Amino acid sequence: GGYGTREAYEILERICAAGLIDYVDLDVAIEPDQFWLGMPPVFVEPHVYRPYAEAVRKAAGKVPVLCVLGRLTSIADGEAAIASGVCDVVGAARALIAEPSLVKNAFEGNEERSRTCIACNWCLHSMLDDGAQTCTINPVSYRERLWDPEKLVPAPQPAKVTVVGGG
């Protein structure tokens, strides 16, 4: 049962036209056996949800749209989505887990310093496994208090180390 996307867009159009909401927050519902698509992994093309965002933008009229495009990895991607008119605000959870300073770095003209989410979905798996969200790219994720840079002190003696299998 239920209703499909066509009906959802019609309902949204009527609600927006009536002035009943201030903004639309687009998220994507998924089937239980495809929960992983809620956070598109590396083998799913970037911005997989853009067609839904475009349809919501059309139905919403002038009501602002916040959307999740799927695998947004850079400020440039978000700016392009906003500039194209597909949305007014973009969501980027994994990009900010991988690099909490992503927006700050972009404002300062240092986006190249930002770590990029590789969509491996370790953040999702770690949360499901033990409730502690961790990140392959950002080892400090979920451990911010333990990795306080002001608490780190240099080793008393320099050491030579060899990294084997660093990839």
What is each of the regions a protein language model found here?
Residues 1-166:
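Flavin-dependent oxidoreductase catalytic cores
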